[in-house]
């Protein structure tokens, strides 16, 4: 079984009414642990690699490790670039054989976010790769992504339809109050489920991604599943 795209996964998740966990990896031991858990649950997996992990471990090594995980487990596994901060980085990941990439241009003005995301989408789709983008900014420190609580902002549901339509993106990460990296365990997250609900109404059956899920309580994960969300790292 080859690596799969997240697009295939999300379609099946909607049919089955479940979310999919995405887990950051940077070495063999981490990949083995995640895959063993996946085998026990017979769950599809998104194994994602950050910019820092690519610099640390070499994307070729990581790709071969993930391919070995597919061969060993027989599970549907996607290899995803997490928080790609430029067209060049996303292009490099696509050329390296990643089946999914995230372009995070959420720090840019809305129009510029659309422009950069559209460029990535064109190159990715030409190569059979799917794209995740982000609207709104999550608080947190992860690799070179650093957004303070003061600069974090919720996603504006009024922008999501235009953004998806103009970019052709395959999934959308939104900000509803989760945080990632060094901020993720600083108190119980105050999640704006009203934003999640409104986005799901405006984008019916469209894959929604929530980052920073490690500290989200199980009851909240159940609610997020109801709205078709995927939660990287969800417990």
What are these regions (language model features)?
Residues 24-25, 212:
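Conserved residues at beta->alpha junctions
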Residues 212-215, 234-235:
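Short acidic/histidine-rich active-site segments
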Residues 4-12, 27-53, 60-76, 84-207, ...:
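Alpha/beta enzyme core
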């Amino acid at each position: 079984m080859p690596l799969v795209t997240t697009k295939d996964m999300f379609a099946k998740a909607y049919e089955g009414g479940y979310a999919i966990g995405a887990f950051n990896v940077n070495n063999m031991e981490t990949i083995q642990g995640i895959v063993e858990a996946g085998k026990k649950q017979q769950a599809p997996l998104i194994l994602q690699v950050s910019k820092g992990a690519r610099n640390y471990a070499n994307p070729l090594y990581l790709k071969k490790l993930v391919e070995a995980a597919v061969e060993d487990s027989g599970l549907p596994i996607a290899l995803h670039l997490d928080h790609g901060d430029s067209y060049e980085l996303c292009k490099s990941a696509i050329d390296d054989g990643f089946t999914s990439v995230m372009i995070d241009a959420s720090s840019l003005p809305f129009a510029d976010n659309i422009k950069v995301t559209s460029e990535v989408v064109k190159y990715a789709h030409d190569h059979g790769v799917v794209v995740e983008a982000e609207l709104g900014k999550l608080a947190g420190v992860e690799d070179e992504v650093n957004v303070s609580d003061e600069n974090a902002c919720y996603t504006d549901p009024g922008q999501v339809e235009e953004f998806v339509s103009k970019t052709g993106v395959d999934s959308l990460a939104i900000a509803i109050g989760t945080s990632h990296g060094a901020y993720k365990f600083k108190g119980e997250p105050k999640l704006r489920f009203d934003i999640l609900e409104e986005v799901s109404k405006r984008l019916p059956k469209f894959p929604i991604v929530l980052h920073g899920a490690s500290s989200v309580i199980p009851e909240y994960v159940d609610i997020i599943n109801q709205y078709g969300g995927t939660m990287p790292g969800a417990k």
